[in-house]
Each structure stands twice: as C-alpha cells, then as structure tokens.
C-alpha cells in the first residue's frame, strides 16, 4: 500500500514539474515604449551584394526579443553631420529570434546617382558604424498589425481606432527596399500551419542585381507553392529573363494578383512615384476598392 502511494506521489510530482516547466516564461521585450529610444550595438555586418548589407544589432540580453508585431516597423535615429536623421526600417529577422535583430539595408553611396549626389544619409551612417557602436531604435510604429489567420488591424491614421479587415488573399506590390515588410508578413503566414491566407507578390526592381532577399523569397515560394506566388519585374532585364519587364502595369496586376473582392487586401511599399502611378492608379482602374488597399 505504501509503495503504491509513493508511486502515485512521484507521478503527481513529475506531472506538476512538467506542467510548471511547460508554462515557459515569456521572453523579455526590448521595445517597451514606442516613444523611447533604445541604443543597440552593432554586433555583425555582412555584405549581401555590391550595395546591400545586413546589419545585426544586439538586444539587451541573449533572452530578449525585439517586440515588434508583424506589420509594424522601427525607426532608427542618429546625428549625421550635426543633423538628426530618422528613417523607418522593417527587420528581416523574425520577432521570435532572441538576442539580436537583423536589418537588410541598401547603401546609397555618395556620387553614384547624379540626382542624389550626397547619397543616403542613414544608410551611409549605418555602413560607417564599427562593431560595438550603437544606434537608437524606436518602435513599434505603423498603422497595420497582422493578427494571424487573415486578420489585419488597420488604422486610417495614428489617432484612429483600428478597423479589422479579414482577407483570404493578399496581393503585394513592392519596389526595392519595400520588400522587407512583405517578407515579414509572408514568413508569418507561411510558418503558421493554421493560417491559410494566400499571398501574391509583384516585386519591381531596376536590375536583377538589385533584387533584395531573393533567396529568402524563392525559398518560401518553393516550399509553399500553393500559398505564395512570386513575380518579378525589372526596368533593365538581362537577356533570357523569364519574368516581367518595365513598370508595374494594370495588365501585370490583372495577371499576377487576385481580382478585386471583399476578401482581398492589396499591400504596397516602395518609392512614392511607384505607389501613386504604378500601383494606386492601376488598382483604381481595375476596380480595387480603397478600403481593400494599404500603403506602408
């Protein structure tokens, strides 16, 4: 009898230990206050292409996560030549990653583009950072949050309450570095086995070498062919290029994005002229309602 009771006691004890252990502590969050600045150190710099680099910044501890909801972005701020420079970025690392955050940034160097002889102030500042030097992060920021399973909370402006939009199909129009919020969302959707939302991306660039995060995008497209459709268009395509060429057109949208519907949301991120003339004007022409569009 005593042996039986002891066995039961041990079983109960093991169950309690397991139950307590399974309720793992939530990882501490770095971005606790969207109005505060958090100086984070550069811990790694990796060259991705001739003008693009990945910058890895350390979080306060190896257990910390950044704390950035899907759909949101951060602001980096720094004094450059005596002036405050602030720029928005979307990390390419998942928010579940502990200890660091990764940004992929296209560096706009001086005297390369005659229209912008000074180049990009923030991107060149990032490129000049030495390992261990810090830059200020602020966030989360943004008007859109993805809640999962096709549910988006979208605010018309910063002071407005969010409106819920449920989409079975998400069209995406991205140009250049505007790909980062799209990849963030694509990864979140395809990594959740309970999320059946389908994504359709048209990604516009000048040349094939300018395609950011191509490997990551094509990896997802290959592993989730029914859930993620990928199409590129280039201003200056190479010979034998099998995707699109030129600006995003109404015909291109018609062919590669889902048609207008109540359960369709179209997201846009890229240079302002592209958003206005290649995206918004063509979406209007094709009958996509304004309530079913969002520009980052």
Curated annotation (Swiss-Prot):
Organism superkingdom: Eukaryota
GO CC aspect terms: membrane; mitochondrion
Entry keyword Flavoprotein: yes
Cofactor dependence: FAD
Catalytic activity: 2 Fe(III)-[cytochrome b5] + NADH = 2 Fe(II)-[cytochrome b5] + NAD(+) + H(+)
Record's bilayer topology term: Single-pass membrane protein
Protein name: NADH-cytochrome b5 reductase 2
Lineage: Eukaryota, Metazoa, Chordata, Craniata, Vertebrata
Gene encoding the protein: cyb5r2
